[in-house]
């Protein structure tokens, strides 16, 4: 839960989460679990679940160096849209079907969440699709978000596991307006506050992550008009890519400047935990020097080695790490698992190796986010667990031992699965650690 400027676990220990995001969409996963088909139906669920189960195993395989602790799940509209209707893009909700959403929430999304949790992962869930470029208080999209989250938050399993499952209200708002379309520094608050209230009205007590404007990079208006929450268990979800935050790039990567710019655009980093739910980087691809595209801000971007944003670890990447380490309360999920580890290699051999193996050809492998985050996630995980919370104690010091399942319910004797062991010690203290039977 959110406590002051940090996330804390059930023992009150500070937690910073690091992981990956993915979407159960065949195209975005390189057709790895199924080839192209015209639509998505119940017969497609099983291969999808099996594929994701392998991913969850890979990203949590500490013996092979993978130390993910969180997974961001996109409830992809490819399942929730009515296949007889045509949506123009991911921001077009005209094809959304509440009946399909309810069906696949039970048959696909919740099973994916359960499997991620069984692998020891916290789960952040985002709604189907992305925000339209312009949103106005009380508009169709605002009502859509309320309806989606009402159905989600009312689910009994979701409510019971709200200490592990958190909600990211929307993906990448760009410009927010008042109901009459006018601009106001109160628009963001007025747009998302009712969505927060709707979720709490269903009895969901877990963390709610609130997005900002500018593709989730501008939060200054929340400093003037903060979200309020009956559970006091919310914070902000942010996106970070090179070229953002005062045009921080490989050419402009002063650490102190990045820290200052980030604090200026996300001022609540000093008072609340921040979750960066999208971030990635890889350098320009020397083989594609003549190709390119314009990014969100109209900046020319040369093709890179397989990420959304273009940058190098030794320049922009280390500047980002300086921001992360300076504040100490910023978690992150990389934009796709293949940018963290080599999915094809894992499916073939069971080996977990960093993503962007293709960069070795140009001696740029260590400049990509896969290699960097495989190392950083481990480093950050070790720092967190070195405080003793997961260290076992001498049997002589233990007065009593209790077992809890991942839902936090006390059990007599663990069967197969992940459990939290709580040991009461002679000095009155308690120690907890996670075990897998």
Residue positions per predicted region:
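C-terminal outer-membrane/trafficking sorting elements
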Residues: 388-437
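Short acidic-hydrophobic surface loop/beta-edge motif
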Residues: 5-8, 136, 421
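Extracellular glycoside hydrolase catalytic/binding regions
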Residues: 24, 28-31, 36-37, 41, ...
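Short capping micro-motif at the N-terminus of alpha-helices
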Residues: 9, 16-18, 295, 413, ...
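Non-catalytic accessory regions flanking glycosidase/transglycosidase catalytic cores in CAZymes
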Residues: 1-67, 83-91, 355-385
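An active-site-proximal structural segment forming one wall of the substrate-binding cleft
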Residues: 39-70, 75, 79-166, 187-198
């Amino acid at each position: 839960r959110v406590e002051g400027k940090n996330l804390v676990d059930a023992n009150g220990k500070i937690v910073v989460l690091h992981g990956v995001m993915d979407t159960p969409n065949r195209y975005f996963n390189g057709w790895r679990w199924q080839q192209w088909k015209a639509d998505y139906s119940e017969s497609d669920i099983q291969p999808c679940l099996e594929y994701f189960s392998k991913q969850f195993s890979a990203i949590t395989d500490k013996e092979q160096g993978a130390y993910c602790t969180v997974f961001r799940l996109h409830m992809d509209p490819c399942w929730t849209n009515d296949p007889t209707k045509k949506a123009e893009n991911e921001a077009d909700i005209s094809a959304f079907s509440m009946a399909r959403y309810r069906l696949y929430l039970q048959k696909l999304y919740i099973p994916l969440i359960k499997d991620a949790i069984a692998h020891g992962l916290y789960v952040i869930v985002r709604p189907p699709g992305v925000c339209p470029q312009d949103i106005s208080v009380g508009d169709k999209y605002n009502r859509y978000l309320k309806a989606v989250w009402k159905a989600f938050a009312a689910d009994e399993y979701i409510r019971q596991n709200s200490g592990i499952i958190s909600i990211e209200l929307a993906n990448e708002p760009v410009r927010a307006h008042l109901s009459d379309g006018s601009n106001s520094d109160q628009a963001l608050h007025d747009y998302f506050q009712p969505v927060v209230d709707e979720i709490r009205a269903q009895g969901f007590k877990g963390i709610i992550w609130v997005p900002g404007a500018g593709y989730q990079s501008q939060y200054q208006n929340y400093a003037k008009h903060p979200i309020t929450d009956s559970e006091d268990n919310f914070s902000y979800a942010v996106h970070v890519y090179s070229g953002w935050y005062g045009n921080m790039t490989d050419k402009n990567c002063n650490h102190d400047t990045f820290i200052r710019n980030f604090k200026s655009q996300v001022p609540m980093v000093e008072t609340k935990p921040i979750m960066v739910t999208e971030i990635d980087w890889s350098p320009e691809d020397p083989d594609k020097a003549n190709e390119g595209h314009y990014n969100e801000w109209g900046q020319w971007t040369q093709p890179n080695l397989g990420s959304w944003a273009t940058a190098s670890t030794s320049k922009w990447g280390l500047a980002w790490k300086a921001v992360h380490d300076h504040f100490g309360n910023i978690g992150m999920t990389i934009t796709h698992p293949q940018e963290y580890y080599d999915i094809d290699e894992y499916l073939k051999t069971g080996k977990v190796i960093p993503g962007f193996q293709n960069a070795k050809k140009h001696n740029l492998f260590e400049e990509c986010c896969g290699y960097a985050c495989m190392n950083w996630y481990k480093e950050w995980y070790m720092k967190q667990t070195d405080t003793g919370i997961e260290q076992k104690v001498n049997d002589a010091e233990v007065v009593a031992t209790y077992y809890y399942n991942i839902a936090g319910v006390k059990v007599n004797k663990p069967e197969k699965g992940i459990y939290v062991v709580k040991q009461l010690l002679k000095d009155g203290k308690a120690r907890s650690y996670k075990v897998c039977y």
